[in-house]
Amino acid sequence: MTFYEYMQTKTKQTDIIGFIAREMSMDNKLFPSLELKKLSIPQWQERILDKVVTGVVQGYVMDGFQTAVKEFEAI
């Protein structure tokens, strides 16, 4: 299972992990030619964080991303 596939199981969550999962899903649908499903975890992290403009939100998203990675690695 890839990180993208794992995150697709989290899209219905109402927390930050669900938000990140929905952003990943939306990016993949908007840019199918980029083959985003194949991105590594650091590449996804960079892509999602590039969308965040304020430091407070960036910290929140970063914490959520790190939690999602820990959950994924625990599988």
Predicted features and spans:
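N-terminal acidic leader/helix
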Residues: 1-22, 27
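A general alpha-helix detector
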Residues: 2-6, 43-48
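Weak global preference for isoleucine
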Residues: 16-20, 41, 48, 75
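Ankyrin repeat (ANK) tandem alpha-helical domains that serve as protein-protein interaction scaffolds
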Residues: 26-31, 46-75
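A Lys/Arg-rich helix-loop hairpin that forms a DNA/phosphate-binding surface
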Residues: 35-36, 40
